[in-house]
Structures are given as structure tokens and as C-alpha cells.
Regions:
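Active-site-adjacent structural elements in enzyme catalytic cores
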Residues: 1-256
């Protein structure tokens, strides 16, 4: 997804990111690097697991949570002793990082709690004149956030699901990994991005129903709708009105 970037070594620039997003200051940012060779400058301890995952998935949608170096500002990490690090795989982002030469703190480029943008137009529509420059790299290929893996514990733990699956992580590490399933209270900060009780919330009404109730619910929803209506179903449905946007899983439901 598109990111809202700032010099990770400049506290004033980092504070501006929090201000523009409306993001709590105790909600840490991910630092983006141009290559895995820069890990030692940001992490106090780069474990063998970190090296394995970096070699396998960087550049790519994987963030490694490691103990932060003493030179990393608490403004970036939300006051926590850990830092999230990633090497993105988009050519424009990589060229920017190489030209800049340092780390760029970059959460998704949207107001805090809203859906992450996948085009430059989404960024402009949400953030407008609050950002100095919008670098248009075209539509995003993935469209979801990076997977975050905590490597500061004895057993690696996925803190946020994303572009790299648990199966692929376990295949590279050769062991099972944990999955964090409980959201932390919003008043207590978060160990990593995407871990608050409410996150990535679209500004839309959502109705859950059983398959046999779909027709009845659609009649009710369409009667009060003031905009587009989408339907996410486990299998294809027939006889839907033309103004319904229908989505269905690309694979077996168990995969989700």
C-alpha cells in the first residue's frame, strides 16, 4: 500500500507523520530500508532467524520486529524497545530509499484507522494538502499491509497478517510460529502497527447474515442505501441486481 514517509532519524519529521495521520504517538512506525545490509544500523541484535527471513522475503511485504539500536529514536517506536524494519519491493520506493541513503518511517498514507490507499489518487483524496509531495508509483500490486513477525521472543510470533503467509514463514524457518490473536486496548498502545482493537475501518455499514437470509437483507439494504452496495459471499450467487458489486473468495474458505 502507499506510505506516508518521513526521515526516521528526524524527530520533527516523525512527529509530523503522527500529526497528519491523526495517529496516537504510542503507536509505532515501521522503518523502511533500501537493503538488508542496513539492519545492523537499526537493530541491536540481528538474529539468525532475522537473516533467514530477510534473505527469503526482502525486498517484500514482511516487517521484522527486532530490538532497536540505541540510535533509534523512541519517537519512531512509540517509546518501545523494539523497531519494525522492512525493505519494500516497489522500484520507486527502493530508488527513493537508495537516493535518500537513510531509513524512512512510513505508515500507510491514510487517516488513522481508515482503509489503506492503493493508488496515489486515494492518498490525495484522504490526506489532500496535508502532505508535501505525492510520489505516484501506480496501483499497488498487493493491496494489503506487510506481515509483521516478532523476533524478540524465543518463538517467532506473527503480530499482523499480511502479504507473506504463515506457511511460507514456517517453511523458511523450519519451525512452527505463533500467531497473536488478541488486540491490545487502544489506551495501552500497541506492540506493532495494526494491533489496536479497531483498525482499517471503512466508513461503511456492514451487515452479516446467513446465506438463506441474503435476499431479505439485500431488499432492506437497497431500500436505504445512498451509495454502492457490495456483497461478499462464499460462493457465486445468481439473480442479483445489476447495481450490486459481488465479491467471492478466490480460493477455499479454509484459506482465509
Amino acid at each position: 500500500v502507499y506510505g506516508l514517509g518521513a526521515d526516521a532519524s528526524n524527530d520533527a519529521a516523525v512527529r509530523r507523520v503522527f500529526e497528519v495521520k491523526g495517529r496516537p504517538s504510542d503507536h509505532p512506525l515501521i522503518v523502511h530500508l533500501s537493503a538488508a545490509s542496513h539492519l545492523d544500523a537499526w537493530a541491536a541484535n540481528v538474529s539468525s532467524n532475522a537473516k533467514l527471513l530477510a534473505d527469503a522475503f526482502w525486498p517484500g511485504p514482511l516487517t521484522l520486529l527486532l530490538e532497536r539500536s540505541s540510535s533509534v529514536s523512541p519517537a519512531v517506536t512509540g517509546g518501545r524497545p523494539t523497531v519494525g524494519l522492512r525493505v519494500p519491493d516497489h522500484p520507486v520506493a527502493l530508488e527513493l530509499l537508495r537516493s535518500f541513503g537513510g531509513g524512512i518511517a512510513g505508515p500507510s498514507a491514510n487517516r488513522f484507522g481508515r482503509v489503506s490507499p492503493t493508488t496515489a489518487a486515494h492518498v490525495i483524496a484522504d490526506l489532500g494538502d496535508d502532505v508535501d509531495v505525492v510520489l505516484d508509483g501506480g496501483p499497488c500490486r498487493v493491496g494489503v499491509e506487510s506481515t509483521i513477525v516478532d523476533l524478540t521472543t524465543d518463538r517467532p510470533v506473527v503480530l499482523r497478517a499480511g502479504g507473506v503467509s504463515v506457511d511460507r514463514l514456517e517453511e523458511v524457518l523450519g519451525c512452527s510460529i505463533g500467531i497473536f490473536v488478541s488486540a491490545e486496548p487502544s489506551t495501552g498502545g500497541a506492540r506493532a502497527p495494526g494491533m489496536l482493537e479497531a483498525h482499517y475501518a471503512p466508513n461503511a455499514r456492514v451487515v452479516l447474515c446467513a446465506e438463506h437470509e441474503i435476499a431479505e437483507v439485500l431488499i432492506e439494504v437497497l431500500g436505504s442505501a445512498t451509495g454502492p452496495v457490495g456483497l461478499l459471499a462464499g460462493s457465486a450467487l445468481v439473480g442479483l441486481p445489476e447495481d450490486i458489486v459481488e465479491l467471492e473468495p478466490a480460493g477455499p474458505a479454509d484459506d482465509y
